Amino acid sequence: MKMFTVISYDIVDDQRRTSVMKVLKGYGVRVQYSVFEAILDAREFHDLSNQLRKIIDPGQDSIRCYRLDQVAAQRTVIYGIGLTTTDPTHYMV
């Protein structure tokens, strides 16, 4: 089952931060400077997690992933500009 996933990151090193951003762009939509939204099934989330863990320095960097079911995702509130990600915009082949 696909789940609405919010991924935020705080990466110290510019090169690692750029690498993380490029990986995330392949899975979802950037909604803020260090925040992405994606709709991922368990396999996609597992693959994404593995890629991100290979990039970061766990002693310096932080990535947080919030997996929301459909009910929780529908309670998302946005103030200001922007839309909630509702459909997958990237497909893995």
From Swiss-Prot:
Gene Ontology biological-process entries: defense response to virus; maintenance of CRISPR repeat elements
EC class name: hydrolase
Key words, A-Z: Antiviral defense, Endonuclease, Hydrolase, Magnesium, Metal-binding, Nuclease
Top-rank taxon, per record: Bacteria
Amino-acid positions noted as binding Mg(2+) in the UniProt annotation, renumbered to this chain: D10
GO molecular function: metal ion binding; RNA endonuclease activity
Required cofactor(s): Mg(2+)
EC number: 3.1.-.-
PANTHER family with a match to the protein in the record: CRISPR-ASSOCIATED ENDORIBONUCLEASE CAS2, CRISPR-ASSOCIATED ENDORIBONUCLEASE CAS2 3
Protein role: CRISPR (clustered regularly interspaced short palindromic repeat), is an adaptive immune system that provides protection against mobile genetic elements (viruses, transposable elements and conjugative plasmids). CRISPR clusters contain sequences complementary to antecedent mobile elements and target invading nucleic acids. CRISPR clusters are transcribed and processed into CRISPR RNA (crRNA). Functions as a ssRNA-specific endoribonuclease. Involved in the integration of spacer DNA into the CRISPR cassette.
Subunit structure: Homodimer, forms a heterotetramer with a Cas1 homodimer.
Family, as annotated: Belongs to the CRISPR-associated endoribonuclease Cas2 protein family.
Protein name (Swiss-Prot/TrEMBL): CRISPR-associated endoribonuclease Cas2 3
Organism: Chloroflexus aurantiacus (strain ATCC 29366 / DSM 635 / J-10-fl)
